From Swiss-Prot:
Belongs to the peptidase T1B family. One of its GO terms (molecular function) is threonine-type endopeptidase activity. Component of the proteasome core, a large protease complex with broad specificity involved in protein degradation. It is an enzyme of class 3 (hydrolase). Keywords: Autocatalytic cleavage, Cytoplasm, Hydrolase, Protease, Proteasome, Threonine protease, Zymogen. The 20S proteasome core is composed of 14 alpha and 14 beta subunits that assemble into four stacked heptameric rings, resulting in a barrel-shaped structure. The two inner rings, each composed of seven catalytic beta subunits, are sandwiched by two outer rings, each composed of seven alpha subunits. The catalytic chamber with the active sites is on the inside of the barrel. Has a gated structure, the ends of the cylinder being occluded by the N-termini of the alpha-subunits. Is capped by the proteasome-associated ATPase, ARC. GO terms for cellular component: cytoplasm; proteasome core complex, beta-subunit complex. It catalyses: Cleavage of peptide bonds with very broad specificity. This is Proteasome subunit beta.
């Protein structure tokens, strides 16, 4: 780069414009997504994939959460990956899909928002942020078609409407504002079922956090690529709150307490049964023949 500008800066650094992405595309294109060599097909286990993320509204903002597992094919690649990030002071992004590319996208998105605010002297509107993320996703389309998708959730506090808002995306960059709740990733079909049953209008923050955890528990129960809370290693899902005060993570202590409470409740709700042959009960009891078994819930046993 030739240095010909005033004060010894290269001309590119003095070019007008508030978009860091446009600047990088012109002066350092190799750092941009989608500039690396491509292939006709890419094995599914070539890179770690993040799995399940959820977000939901509560009466004063948004709760956004993600499990901690990344997989490579049938292998657990990481047990403590982070999938929920602050985009700026009043918005958040959660990622599912190809982990390395998604984390790179998050960093570029954070830098893009920061660069815009420094140049313009004011932050982008929430709709502007959501649209900018959509544009960035569209540049990844060819990689998504080769098996390396990125599917984020974006959420933030809208200072104009004085409310939290949720945005879901597809791999083409399509942007969809979602009322109430949304989810993405391999366990999203199970998480969505839990959210449908549990979400109610005007939730408080504590209940909304519990519902997000319940949705991830249900997803982990049926999807091998989604991790539930790891009680032995004390690894919990990551959850963040976005409201008029800004972005903040839920503390480890609060997550541990909430997960322990859910585990206790579910263990109490689980009904164990025993199969007994009439007249014979004990360690030596053999399996009964068809038609002779009696199912006795433990709660009914004396």
């Amino acid at each position: 780069m030739t240095i010909t500008g005033s004060r010894g800066f290269p001309d590119g650094y003095l070019a007008p414009g508030s978009s860091f992405l446009d600047f990088a595309a012109q002066h350092a294109p190799t750092i941009m997504p989608g500039t690396q060599p491509t292939f006709d097909t890419i094995p599914q286990d070539i890179a770690p994939h993040g799995t399940t993320i959820v977000a939901l509204e509560y009466h004063n903002g948004i709760i956004i959460a993600g499990d901690r597992r990344a997989t490579m094919g049938t292998t657990i690649a990481h047990r403590e990956i982070e999938k929920v990030f602050a985009a700026d002071e009043h918005s958040a992004i959660a990622i599912a899909g190809t982990a390395g590319l998604a984390i790179e996208l998050v960093r570029l998105f954070q830098l893009e928002l920061e660069h815009y605010e420094k140049i313009e002297g004011t932050p982008l509107s929430l709709d502007g942020k959501a649209n900018r993320l959509s544009t960035m996703l569209r540049s990844h389309l060819h990689l998504a078609l080769q098996g390396l998708p990125i599917v984020p959730i974006f959420a933030g506090w809208d200072s104009t409407r004085h409310q939290g808002r949720l945005f879901a995306y597809d791999v083409t960059g399509g942007r969809y504002e979602e009322p109430n709740f949304t989810c993405a990733g391999s366990g999203s079909v199970f998480a969505r079922s839990a959210l449908k049953k549990l979400w109610k209008p005007q939730l408080d923050a504590t209940r909304a956090i519990t519902i997000a955890l319940e949705a991830l528990w249900d997803a982990a129960d049926d999807d091998t690529a989604t991790a539930g809370p790891d009680i032995i290693r004390r690894i919990w899902p990551i959850i963040a709150v976005i409201d008029h005060k800004g972005f903040r993570y839920v503390s480890e202590a609060d997550l541990a307490h909430a997960n322990d409470t859910i585990a206790h409740q579910r263990s109490q709700d689980h009904q164990h049964v025993r199969v007994l042959e009439p007249g014979r009960d004990g360690p030596g009891n053999r399996l009964p023949s068809q038609g002779s078994a009696t199912i006795i819930p433990e709660s009914d046993q004396s």
